[in-house]
UniProtKB/Swiss-Prot annotation:
Gene name of the record: wzzB
Function: Confers a modal distribution of chain length on the O-antigen component of lipopolysaccharide (LPS). Gives rise to a reduced number of short chain molecules and increases in numbers of longer molecules.
Pathway(s) per entry: Bacterial outer membrane biogenesis; lipopolysaccharide biosynthesis
Residue intervals on the Periplasmic side: 53-294
Protein name (record): Chain length determinant protein
Origin species: Shigella dysenteriae
Taxonomic classification: Bacteria, Pseudomonadati, Pseudomonadota, Gammaproteobacteria, Enterobacterales
């Protein structure tokens, strides 16, 4: 019984062993076909590597500008808005926000070109607005680094131009408001002067009618509009001449307004050097390209060539066996 079982077991496994051996024999006999297929695949892979565009990614990290970088801008805002000037921290957030928006707009424009360019900006740390990671994909390592630095500078210049334009518009508006305020105060001061002269002239008429030529009071502080004629016609005539040649009287706010106007007029916006960002890490020079990967490409070529060659050998032998039957 033991011998019969062994024979049965041998009968069950021999076909599989023979098939596997036969398969290996077929592949060995067709090894030249497989080798040629692998060589062809490697040649195609080398050709692909020769013509494929390389991709190198340069990366930089930016954040909001330092206080010193926006000192001139902050001073200009103080001159224009005075006590209503935003906090320095608010200005920093505004500037980096404008930089981010302008950079995103540029990235979208480059992506929609006939030959798209990949420029990206995103937070460096998840769930945190700052710092920001910006990157550019180029065909060479040096080109990617140079292009990224160029686009960062381009966006910074654009934001700078926009800020200068905003400042000039605000300066023009502030100048107009201050000039209007000065004119209003001057008109009020002139009206007060004219009113004072008319009041004295009216008192002079009363004094002449009452034939009061000399002062009738000892303390001028006690004189009111109704009793002004008691100063006498001689004093009133002298007062009219004095008031007519006397300069307009202004409040301290008038002179403060004039000072503010002079400060705004002396403000030189074109001389401001405003930066909307600060480097945490300057554009890197990539040392490894993103694609194509030579090693992976060649390994895949060998595997694919071997599989294709094996398929050709097995398929050809199967077709021969079928025709023989």
């Amino acid at each position: 019984m033991r011998v019969e079982n062994n024979n049965v077991s041998g009968q069950n496994h021999d076909p599989e062993q023979i098939d596997l051996i036969d398969l290996l024999v077929q592949l060995w006999r067709g090894k030249m076909t497989i080798i040629i297929s692998v060589i062809v695949a490697i040649a195609l892979a080398i050709g692909y590597l020769a013509v494929a565009k390389e991709k190198w990614t340069s990366t930089a990290i930016v954040t909001q500008p330092d206080v010193g970088q926006i000192a001139g801008y902050n001073n200009a805002m103080n001159v224009i808005y005075g006590q209503a000037t935003p906090k320095v921290s608010d200005l920093q957030e505004t500037l980096i926000g404008r930089f981010s928006s302008a950079f995103s707009a540029l990235a979208e424009t480059l992506d929609n070109q006939e030959e798209p360019e990949k420029l990206t900006i995103e937070p460096s740390v998840k769930n945190q607005q700052l710092p920001l990671t910006v990157s550019y994909v180029g065909q060479t390592a040096e080109g990617a680094q140079m292009k990224l630095a160029q686009y960062i500078q381009q966006v910074d210049d654009k934001v700078n131009q926009e800020l200068e334009k905003d400042l000039k518009d605000n300066i023009a508006l502030g100048r107009k408001n201050l000039q209007d305020s000065l004119r209003t105060q001057e008109v009020v001061a002139q009206e007060q002067k004219d009113l004072r002269i008319r009041q004295i002239q009216e008192a002079l008429q009363y004094a002449n009618q009452a034939q009061v030529t000399k002062p009738q009071v000892q303390q001028t502080e006690d004189v009111t509009q109704d009793t002004l004629f008691l100063l006498g016609s001689e004093a009133l005539e002298s007062m009219i001449k004095h008031e007519a040649t006397r300069p307009l009287v202004f409040s301290p706010s008038y002179y403060q307004t004039r000072q503010n106007l002079l400060d705004i007029e002396n403000l030189k916006v074109d001389d401001l050097d405003i930066h909307a960002y600060r480097y945490v890490m300057k554009p890197t020079l990539p040392i490894r390209r993103d694609s194509p990967k030579k090693a992976i490409t060649l390994i895949l070529a060998v595997l694919l060539g071997g599989m294709v060659g094996a398929g050709i050998v097995l398929g050809r032998n199967a077709l021969r066996n079928y025709n023989a039957k």
